[in-house]
Amino acid sequence: MADQLTEEQIAEFKEAFSLFDKDGDGTITTKELGTVMRSLGQNPTEAELQDMINEVDADGNGTIDFPEFLTMMARKMKDTDSEEEIREAFRVFDKDGNGYISAAELRHVMTNLGEKLTDEEVDEMIREADIDGDGQVNYEEFVQMMTAK
């Protein structure tokens, strides 16, 4: 299944994987998964984290390695993001709930994920998604960005 991913997608997933893999040992533990999910405003229980890991832990060693992570991402993409997942993601970014993602809100979430971005990089990300040019990202623009192939 992971063989249907483009090189660009694999590179993006590698970057995402390293955000989860806090200690850089090449595997994601339940603790690391929990840290990232909490930084995104989720509050999973230990059991939920274990279930999430077990779902993709092909070799049964209790952690997720990069090939397992790729399989999980490929699977998720095949079920292409349901509207509800996209709306949920939008809410994570839209901290003040005004229906727009500002540069400050984007920077806040990315920083929580451990991504240190310059102001230019954040502005560039907003510009790429900002179709109507108002300097922020509304829900429609967010959907376009998330579903762009």
From Swiss-Prot:
Phosphothreonine carried by residues: 45, 111
Residues with the N-acetylalanine modification: 2
Description of how activity is regulated: (Microbial infection) Inactivated by S.flexneri OspC1 and OspC3 proteins, which specifically bind the apo-form of calmodulin, thereby preventing calcium-binding and activity.
Sites where the protein binds Ca(2+) 2: 57, 59, 61, 63, 68
Alphabetically ordered keywords of this record: Acetylation, Calcium, Cell projection, Cilium, Cytoplasm, Cytoskeleton, Disease variant, Flagellum, Host-virus interaction, Isopeptide bond, Long QT syndrome, Metal-binding, Methylation, Phosphoprotein, Repeat, Ubl conjugation
One biological process term in Gene Ontology: G2/M transition of mitotic cell cycle
Region (Necessary and sufficient for interaction with PCP4): 77-149
MF terms in GO: adenylate cyclase activator activity; calcium channel inhibitor activity; calcium channel regulator activity; calcium ion binding; calcium-dependent protein binding; protein kinase binding; protein phosphatase activator activity; protein serine/threonine kinase activator activity
Post-translational modification: Ubiquitination results in a strongly decreased activity. Phosphorylation results in a decreased activity.
Effect on the protein of changing residue 90 to L: In LQT14; significantly decreased of KCNN2 calcium-activated potassium channel activity; not changed KCNN2 expression; not changed KCNN2 location at membrane; decreased thermal stability in presence of calcium ions; decreased interaction with RYR2
SMART domains in the record: EFh
Top-rank taxon: Eukaryota
Record PTM N6-acetyllysine, positions in chain: 22, 95
Modified residues (N6,N6,N6-trimethyllysine): 116
Main localization category: cytoplasm
Residues that coordinate or bind Ca(2+) 3: 94, 96, 98, 100, 105
Binding-site residues, Ca(2+) 4: 130, 132, 134, 136, 141
Localization of this protein: Cytoplasm, Cytoskeleton, Spindle; Cytoplasm, Cytoskeleton, Spindle pole; Cytoplasm, Cytoskeleton, Microtubule organizing center, Centrosome; Cell projection, Cilium, Flagellum
Assembly information from the UniProt record: Homotetramer. Interacts with MYO1C, MYO5A and RRAD. Interacts with MYO10. Interacts with CEP97, CCP110, TTN/titin and SRY. Interacts with USP6; the interaction is calcium dependent. Interacts with CDK5RAP2. Interacts with SCN5A. Interacts with RYR1. Interacts with FCHO1. Interacts with MIP in a 1:2 stoichiometry; the interaction with the cytoplasmic domains from two MIP subunits promotes MIP water channel closure. Interacts with ORAI1; this may play a role in the regulation of ORAI1-mediated calcium transport. Interacts with IQCF1. Interacts with SYT7.
Disease tied to this entry: Ventricular tachycardia, catecholaminergic polymorphic, 4: An arrhythmogenic disorder characterized by stress-induced, bidirectional ventricular tachycardia that may degenerate into cardiac arrest and cause sudden death. Patients present with recurrent syncope, seizures, or sudden death after physical activity or emotional stress. CPVT4 inheritance is autosomal dominant.
Name of the protein this chain belongs to: Calmodulin-1
Source species of the chain: Homo sapiens
Gene (name only): CALM1
